[in-house]
Curated annotation (Swiss-Prot):
Chief location bin: secreted
Cysteine-cysteine disulfides: C34-C78, C45-C65, C51-C72, C55-C74
Protein name per its UniProtKB record: Defensin SD2
Biological processes annotated in GO: defense response to fungus; killing of cells of another organism
Its biological purpose: May play a protective role in flowers by protecting the reproductive organs from potential pathogen attack.
Keyword set includes 4Fe-4S: no
UniProt cross-references to InterPro entries, sorted A to Z: Defensin_plant, Scorpion_toxin-like, Scorpion_toxin-like_sf
Signal sequence segment: 1-20
GO cellular component terms attached to this protein's record: extracellular region
Residue ranges of coiled coil: none
Tissue: Highest expression in flowers and to a lesser extent in leaves. Lower levels in hypocotyls. No expression in roots and cotyledons.
Keyword annotations: Antimicrobial, Cell wall, Disulfide bond, Fungicide, Plant defense, Secreted, Signal
Amino acid sequence: MKSSMKMFAALLLVVMCLLANEMGGPLVVEARTCESQSHKFKGTCLSDTNCANVCHSERFSGGKCRGFRRRCFCTTHC
């Protein structure tokens, strides 16, 4: 009886380890996004598209309007 309980516990442990590995799936890592206020954008930022276009001219990957004062912030992967 004791050996069958030990065998059952060992088998249960192996099954749990296998299931834990299967549930994890591949690990995906996203790059961080860094922001910097645009130096060329003038005025209140009302359009993300306009902000992104100005940021592209500053060699950033994109841009968005942010904050209470609606400033253009350029974004890039860092």
